[in-house]
Amino acid sequence: MKIKIQKIHPNALIPKYQTDGSSGFDLHAVEEVMIKPHSVGLVKIGICLSLEVGYELQVRTRSGLALNHQVMVLNSPGTVDNDYRGEIKVILANLSDKDFKVQVGDRIAQGVVQKTYKAEFIECEQLDETSRGSGGFGSTGVSKA
C-alpha cells in the first residue's frame, strides 16, 4: 500500500518502519512541548496523509515511553479516518510526577494502518440470549495474580 504524505512543517519527517517485521512506524514531533506531571499535551507531527478507502491510521503508545517515562497516547489507539486531510497530532498524557519534555524529532507515538469495515445496524426488539447475558465489568472473574 502506498500512502501519500504532505509535509507541512520544515521539521517534519516521513514515517518509516524501523525493521522489516515492524507493524508500526514512528511518528516524530516537529516542535518542543513540555508536558507537566499528570497533564496532557498536544504534539504536532507536521504531516498530512491520504489513506486508501477502507483503511484507518491507528496512533498508538510507544512501549518505551510508557515503561520508562509513564507517557502514553491518551486516546490510544487514536483513529485517523481515511477522509481526514489535516495535520496529524498526538495527545500525550504524562502520568509521572516529573515534567516530560518532547524534543524536535522525538519518536512520540507509532502509527499502524488497519483495515476497516462498515457495519449495517439493524434495529430489533430483543437480542439473542447468551450465557454471559448483560454481565459487565468483572463479570467473568477477576485474576488472582
From Swiss-Prot:
GO terms for molecular function: dUTP diphosphatase activity; magnesium ion binding. Pathway: Pyrimidine metabolism; dUMP biosynthesis; dUMP from dCTP (dUTP route): step 2/2. Its cofactor is Mg(2+). One of its GO terms (biological process) is dUTP catabolic process. Keywords: Hydrolase, Magnesium, Metal-binding, Nucleotide metabolism. It holds the Pfam family dUTPase. InterPro entries: dUTPase, dUTPase-like, dUTPase-like_sf, dUTPase_trimeric. Substrate binds at residues 62-64, 75, 79-81, 89. Belongs to the dUTPase family. This is Deoxyuridine 5'-triphosphate nucleotidohydrolase. It comes from Helicobacter pylori (strain ATCC 700392 / 26695) (Campylobacter pylori).
